[in-house]
């Protein structure tokens, strides 16, 4: 076959490959197709075009009619629920109808052609059939499960000869008529045909599984229990092993059944309705590892959207960049030996340290030091929400005091209730976290390995998961946070998931307390809320669905710390979860509708303003102990006892909620953002001990803040130059402090991120220097122009004085000459203004026609990022009426309409021309007013056009923003957060 013929065959493909069918994308028909190439997937085309085997119209009509008949039969049974005798007669009638249907099914099965063989979809619809005299009626398409129970214990009734003959006929017909490919559902009244024996057996098993349900009534959010008024009757099907089971009727009145409208498609169901969740519906971003060894997915709120290297584990970084980078890689579990040398299977046994060795290891002087450091620096951001500090420290001191008395130590670690508060794995995890604040990475690895060994390896050296306890749960969460700081993202996520599952196994989410043991109740409550906070932090940071759920309408219970900061932080997280979810929810159906995306964007922007107000209300509602503002922060920053963790949590929530809009020239509450940046600078610059900042909450808040500052600085122009110059200085400071405070050589998670930020800021710093030089040159040119104008005014005044001294007959000639000079000067000034406009930096002329939409966007962005410094002048809620804001939105969303580009270009040109004319008119009017006030009656009424002379002359606007590539990447980059939310992606990650 020639290549040309092969190409034609590929172009004639009428079916899509399996990958394109899965992701619902258009397939180009190539082998492999473009979508499979981009995803490194195997391109497989189905051998059979199922469209050629569609159901016939007659077959579909039969299904619809049969479905309606089944619905009528169910409704007739429900109507007779209060009359047992009539109900029995109706059931007998249905059985007789099914028997007559079986007699006609053989003759009509061959008459309906074009119907495919009985498939799963047909089988699920044909769920009404008889089984040896037993009736089961079910309609899944109508969402109903209806069981007919014929009680054989209360009343024995012998079957009539007619029913026996019907049963025999049913059995014979079933055995003698296998399902044929051309079989179909007949239009015979009352009931569907009986399927083949294999299908009967399968359905019999499904029915047995359904009969295990203890409650035969609809379960939903509105049903309180078996005594509810809408409970369905006790009508169930009984399956017996014999084909000759008799039929009996329970003469006792059944419970009342709900009456459903005959026209409605819904029927009662035995399946519980899913609980509502306020989790995030995010479009995931996938980061494949080198060689495709793993695949990590992150949602829209994640901070890991700047670079692929941010999400790599240490082993992936080592494979990608080699072993030159210093890795904080954990050691394997020590002392592993092979118990068998068999080549087919090798049994692994871990030789754990003895209890004496472990006690000595966790009670030496170095361990005591690091244990104290953990509660000094790690308590405020995390441990205070998870571990009862006083109780754990007291028990650890007792262990250290009795370290030579092994029996006493074993009693503390193994007997109730002290074993609910402390364990070896928890002590080792705390020592490892304390070693991190001493930059002792070897000690971190040593004690972290010890903690994980005690968690999962028993005394026999075997891997176990059958023990749950609160100290083990706490140790898992602490180890997960340490793993995250060391760059092991997958390990941290999975370890925290095991811990949360263990908490559910312990029942810490039940909120049921025993007054006889208040200490355990307080511990259970504290561990739940600490786990909840860590779970929500992880969900926001990774952009993933969380595990623990708390309804914000339910009163919260905080037993051990009613007046502390735990209720404040928990309430903040609970209230903001639905807010963040609504901001980040992906709307994939508007992908090809820019106008709808624009509408959704404006709606979410409007919601964002209300959410920011709610955040401000939460902050203002704090008690005096925890409330802060900029002035309070300045006065208390040098006090080391002041806890700033609640402030950092507030910053993190605000930055996550506003992240998509902070990456636009105009799009968020810039005033609050400026306030947060200033406060964060004060904390990081003047805090007495910067080790209090060495935690993951500070790290993620700092990463989001730097990303937002990079975006804002990228939009620098003449209007916002002053504010963005301040942003640039703060950006440089934050990156320097990030390397100092977060120990990038110890916390591998920071190393590559910090390097990327440094490269980006160096580039922006060069652009800012160039912009500053241009603006300085422009300012000098303006000063020279003003000096020339002042000289011109002085000459005019001197000439006027000379005119007053000259004879009257010479004045007229001199006045004519002066008017001519004024006209020439006016023409010359207009030419200078035009030349100045032309000399401004513009995109290259040769690319105007080739890339005009991009040029148009860059020119329209010169006024899009004016700083909002006064809420009264520029309130955030009035941005929907802001012309510059709406112009930015048009650039974002109308860009994808290629057919309207020419019309849009003409409109933008006309709009720009009109704006320029209006600006010139306004300037001329202002100049005339100033001249009228300064000039005397003898001076000419028309002077050469000159710019206005305010106190601070306005700097001409530059036609380009500082770094237009950043804005363009928001629209073009498929991996951007803004792109994932508002459906800009042309390829996307929605697999």
From Swiss-Prot:
<dbReference type="Pfam" id="PF00172">
    <property type="entry name" value="Zn_clus"/>
</dbReference>
<feature type="compositionally biased region" description="Polar residues">
    <location>
        <begin position="169"/>
        <end position="187"/>
    </location>
</feature>
<keyword id="KW-0862">Zinc</keyword>
<dbReference type="GO" id="GO:0005634">
    <property type="term" value="C:nucleus"/>
</dbReference>
<feature type="compositionally biased region" description="Basic and acidic residues">
    <location>
        <begin position="807"/>
        <end position="817"/>
    </location>
</feature>
<feature type="compositionally biased region" description="Low complexity">
    <location>
        <begin position="795"/>
        <end position="806"/>
    </location>
</feature>
<dbReference type="GO" id="GO:1900231">
    <property type="term" value="P:regulation of single-species biofilm formation on inanimate substrate"/>
</dbReference>
<feature type="compositionally biased region" description="Low complexity">
    <location>
        <begin position="152"/>
        <end position="168"/>
    </location>
</feature>
<feature type="DNA-binding region" description="Zn(2)-C6 fungal-type">
    <location>
        <begin position="17"/>
        <end position="43"/>
    </location>
</feature>
<keyword id="KW-0539">Nucleus</keyword>
<dbReference type="GO" id="GO:0006357">
    <property type="term" value="P:regulation of transcription by RNA polymerase II"/>
</dbReference>
<keyword id="KW-0804">Transcription</keyword>
<dbReference type="InterPro" id="IPR036864">
    <property type="entry name" value="Zn2-C6_fun-type_DNA-bd_sf"/>
</dbReference>
<dbReference type="GO" id="GO:0000981">
    <property type="term" value="F:DNA-binding transcription factor activity, RNA polymerase II-specific"/>
</dbReference>
<feature type="compositionally biased region" description="Basic and acidic residues">
    <location>
        <begin position="825"/>
        <end position="855"/>
    </location>
</feature>
<dbReference type="GO" id="GO:0030447">
    <property type="term" value="P:filamentous growth"/>
</dbReference>
<dbReference type="GO" id="GO:0036180">
    <property type="term" value="P:filamentous growth of a population of unicellular organisms in response to biotic stimulus"/>
</dbReference>
<comment type="function">
    <text>Transcription factor that mediates conventional biofilm formation and plays a key role in microcolony formation under both flow and static conditions and to epithelial surfaces. Modulates infection of mammalian hosts.</text>
</comment>
<feature type="region of interest" description="Disordered">
    <location>
        <begin position="792"/>
        <end position="875"/>
    </location>
</feature>
<dbReference type="GO" id="GO:0001216">
    <property type="term" value="F:DNA-binding transcription activator activity"/>
</dbReference>
<dbReference type="GO" id="GO:0000785">
    <property type="term" value="C:chromatin"/>
</dbReference>
<feature type="region of interest" description="Disordered">
    <location>
        <begin position="150"/>
        <end position="188"/>
    </location>
</feature>
<protein>
    <recommendedName>
        <fullName>Transcription factor ROB1</fullName>
    </recommendedName>
</protein>
<dbReference type="Pfam" id="PF04082">
    <property type="entry name" value="Fungal_trans"/>
</dbReference>
<keyword id="KW-0805">Transcription regulation</keyword>
<dbReference type="GO" id="GO:0044011">
    <property type="term" value="P:single-species biofilm formation on inanimate substrate"/>
</dbReference>
<dbReference type="GO" id="GO:0043565">
    <property type="term" value="F:sequence-specific DNA binding"/>
</dbReference>
<dbReference type="GO" id="GO:0008270">
    <property type="term" value="F:zinc ion binding"/>
</dbReference>
<dbReference type="InterPro" id="IPR007219">
    <property type="entry name" value="Transcription_factor_dom_fun"/>
</dbReference>
<keyword id="KW-0479">Metal-binding</keyword>
<dbReference type="GO" id="GO:0006351">
    <property type="term" value="P:DNA-templated transcription"/>
</dbReference>
<dbReference type="InterPro" id="IPR051615">
    <property type="entry name" value="Transcr_Regulatory_Elem"/>
</dbReference>
<dbReference type="GO" id="GO:1900445">
    <property type="term" value="P:positive regulation of filamentous growth of a population of unicellular organisms in response to biotic stimulus"/>
</dbReference>
<feature type="region of interest" description="Disordered">
    <location>
        <begin position="901"/>
        <end position="959"/>
    </location>
</feature>
<feature type="compositionally biased region" description="Low complexity">
    <location>
        <begin position="907"/>
        <end position="931"/>
    </location>
</feature>
<keyword id="KW-0238">DNA-binding</keyword>
<dbReference type="InterPro" id="IPR001138">
    <property type="entry name" value="Zn2Cys6_DnaBD"/>
</dbReference>
């Amino acid at each position: 076959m020639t290549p040309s013929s092969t190409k034609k065959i590929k172009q004639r493909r009428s079916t899509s490959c399996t990958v394109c069918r899965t992701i619902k994308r258009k397939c180009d028909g190539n082998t492999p197709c473009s979508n499979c190439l981009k995803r490194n997937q195997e391109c497989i085309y189905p051998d059979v075009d199922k469209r050629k085997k569609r159901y016939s119209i007659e077959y579909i009509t039969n299904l619809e009619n049969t479905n309606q008949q089944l619905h009528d039969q169910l409704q007739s049974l429900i109507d007779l629920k209060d009359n047992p005798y009539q109900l029995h007669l109706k059931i007998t009638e249905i059985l007789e109808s099914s028997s007559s249907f079986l007699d006609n099914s053989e003759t009509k099965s061959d008459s309906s052609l074009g119907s495919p063989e009985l498939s799963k979809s047909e089988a699920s619809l044909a769920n009404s059939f008889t089984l040896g005299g037993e009736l089961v009626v079910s309609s899944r398409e109508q969402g109903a499960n209806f069981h007919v129970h014929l009680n054989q214990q209360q009343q024995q009734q012998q079957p009539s000869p007619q029913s026996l003959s019907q049963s025999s006929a049913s059995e014979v017909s079933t055995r003698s008529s296998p399902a044929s490919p051309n079989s179909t559902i007949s239009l015979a009244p009352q009931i569907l045909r009986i399927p083949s024996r294999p299908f009967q057996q399968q359905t019999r098993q499904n029915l047995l599984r359904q009969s295990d349900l203890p409650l035969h009534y609809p379960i939903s959010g509105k049903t309180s229990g078996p005594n509810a008024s809408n409970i369905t009757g006790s009508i169930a099907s009984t399956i017996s092993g014999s084909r000759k089971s008799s039929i009996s009727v329970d003469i006792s009145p059944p419970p009342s059944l709900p009456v459903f409208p005959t026209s409605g498609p819904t029927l009662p169901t035995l399946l519980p309705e899913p609980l509502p969740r306020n989790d995030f519906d995010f479009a995931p971003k996938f980061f494949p590892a080198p060689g495709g060894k793993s695949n990590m997915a992150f949602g829209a709120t994640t901070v890991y959207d700047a670079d692929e290297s941010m999400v790599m584990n240490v082993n992936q970084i080592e494979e990608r960049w080699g072993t030159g980078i210093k890795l904080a890689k954990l050691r394997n579990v020590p002392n592993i030996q092979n118990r068998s040398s068999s080549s087919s299977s090798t049994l692994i046994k871990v030789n754990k340290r003895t209890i004496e060795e472990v006690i000595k290891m966790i009670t030496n002087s170095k361990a005591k030091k690091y244990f104290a450091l953990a509660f000094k620096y790690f308590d405020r951001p995390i441990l205070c929400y998870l571990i009862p500090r006083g109780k754990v420290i007291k028990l650890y001191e007792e262990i250290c005091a009795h370290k030579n008395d092994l029996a006493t130590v074993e009693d503390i670690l193994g007997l109730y209730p002290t074993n609910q508060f402390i364990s070896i794995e928890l002590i080792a995890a705390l020592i490892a976290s304390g070693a991190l604040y001493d930059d002792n990475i070897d000690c971190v690895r040593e004690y972290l390995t010890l903690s994980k060994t005690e968690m999962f390896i028993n005394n026999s050296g075997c891997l176990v998961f059958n023990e749950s306890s609160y100290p083990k749960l706490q140790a898992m969460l602490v180890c997960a946070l340490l793993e995250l700081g060391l760059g092991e993202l997958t390990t941290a996520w999975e370890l925290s998931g095991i811990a949360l599952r263990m908490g559910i196994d312990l029942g810490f989410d039940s909120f049921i307390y025993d007054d006889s043991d208040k200490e355990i109740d307080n511990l259970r409550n504290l561990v739940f809320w600490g786990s909840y906070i860590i779970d929500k932090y992880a969900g926001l940071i990774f952009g993933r669905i969380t595990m623990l759920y708390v309804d914000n309408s339910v009163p919260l219970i905080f037993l051990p710390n009613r007046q502390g900061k735990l209720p404040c932080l928990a309430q903040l997280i609970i209230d903001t979860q639905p807010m963040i979810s609504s901001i980040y929810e992906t709307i994939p159906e508007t992908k090809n509708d820019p106008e709808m995306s624009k509408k959704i964007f404006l709606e979410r922007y409007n919601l964002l303003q209300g959410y920011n107000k709610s955040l401000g209300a939460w902050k203002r509602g704090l008690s005096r102990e925890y409330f802060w503002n900029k002035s309070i922060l300045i006065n208390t920053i040098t006090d080391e006892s002041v806890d700033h963790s609640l402030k950092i949590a507030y910053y993190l929530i605000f930055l996550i909620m506003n992240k998509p809009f902070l990456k636009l020239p105009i799009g968020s509450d810039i005033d609050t953002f400026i306030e947060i940046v200033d406060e964060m600078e004060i904390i990081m610059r003047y805090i007495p001990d910067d080790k209090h900042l060495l935690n993951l909450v500070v790290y993620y808040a700092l990463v989001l803040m730097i990303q937002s500052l990079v975006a804002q600085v990228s939009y620098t122009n003449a209007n916002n130059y002053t504010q963005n110059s301040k942003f640039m200085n703060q950006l440089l400071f934050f990156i320097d402090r990030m390397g100092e405070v977060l120990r990038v050589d110890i916390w591998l998670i920071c190393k590559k991120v910090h390097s990327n930020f440094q490269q980006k800021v160096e580039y922006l710093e060069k652009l800012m220097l160039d912009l500053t030089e241009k603006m300085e040159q422009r300012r000098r040119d303006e000063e020279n122009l003003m000096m020339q104008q002042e000289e011109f005014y002085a000459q005019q005044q001197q000439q006027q004085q000379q005119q007053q001294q000259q004879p009257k007959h010479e004045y007229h000639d001199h006045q004519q000459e002066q008017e001519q000079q004024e006209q020439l000067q006016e023409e010359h000034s207009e030419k200078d203004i035009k030349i100045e406009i032309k000399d401004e930096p513009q995109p290259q002329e040769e690319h105007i026609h080739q890339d005009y939409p991009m040029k148009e966007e860059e020119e329209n962005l010169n006024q899009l990022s004016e700083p909002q410094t006064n809420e009264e002048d520029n309130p955030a809620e009035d941005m929907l009426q802001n012309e510059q804001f709406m112009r930015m939105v048009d650039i974002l969303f109308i860009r994808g309409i290629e057919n309207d580009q020419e019309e849009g270009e003409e409109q933008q040109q006309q709009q720009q021309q009109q704006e320029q004319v209006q600006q010139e008119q306004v300037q001329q009017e202002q100049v005339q007013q100033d001249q009228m006030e300064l000039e005397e009656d003898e001076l000419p009424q028309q002077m050469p056009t000159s710019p206005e002379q305010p106190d601070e002359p306005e700097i001409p606007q530059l036609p380009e923003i500082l770094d237009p590539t950043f804005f363009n990447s928001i629209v073009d980059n498929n991996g951007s957060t803004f792109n994932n939310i508002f459906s800009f992606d042309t390829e996307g990650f929605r697999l």
